[in-house]
Amino acid sequence: MQVILLDKIGNLGGLGDQVNVKSGYARNFLIPQGKAVMATKDNVAMFETRRAELEAKVAEQLAASEARAESVNTLEGVTIASKAGDEGKLFGSIGTRDIADAITAAGVAVAKSEVRLPEGALRNIGEFEVSIQLHSEVFATAKIAIVAAE
């Protein structure tokens, strides 16, 4: 299925690219999320007239994401308290929701879908650097300290 991308999509293309994707991916994800439109003659003409507006919108989103990344990078002392055993192992784990809530409480709004934990949930006491993807091109790093709750 041919679609016109309205946003940069990883491993697919950038704004204005006409790409061929599976119909289920287009119908269930790209089109409902507003990231693509069907590549009909009318939509191609409509896109060409709105190209400058869409490029300005994408640039504005990128600038806002870079500003958020700067504020995440400057955060000091994001601490999460959790019950732990004597040897530093947590009872349970610290996941993306816990990290997003802690960073949001520290003053920068972060959604749990933006937190990246490639090794999975954190299960030990200590200091960790957590990657946060605020935009397809913008990454930030937050220092998280996990301490034992009293």
From Swiss-Prot:
SUPFAM superfamilies attached to this UniProt entry: L9 N-domain-like (SSF55658), Ribosomal protein L9 C-domain (SSF55653)
PANTHER family, per the entry: 50S RIBOSOMAL PROTEIN L9
Function: Binds to the 23S rRNA.
InterPro entries hit by this protein: Ribosomal_bL9, Ribosomal_bL9/RNase_H1_N, Ribosomal_bL9_bac/chp, Ribosomal_bL9_C, Ribosomal_bL9_C_sf, Ribosomal_bL9_N, Ribosomal_bL9_N_sf
GO molecular function ontology, one term from the record: structural constituent of ribosome
PROSITE patterns per UniProt: RIBOSOMAL_L9
Key word Ribonucleoprotein present: yes
GO CC field: ribonucleoprotein complex; ribosome
Annotated Gene3D superfamilies: Ribosomal protein L9, C-terminal domain (3.10.430.100), Ribosomal protein L9, N-terminal domain (3.40.5.10)
Protein name as it appears in the record: Large ribosomal subunit protein bL9
Family recorded in the similarity comment: Belongs to the bacterial ribosomal protein bL9 family.
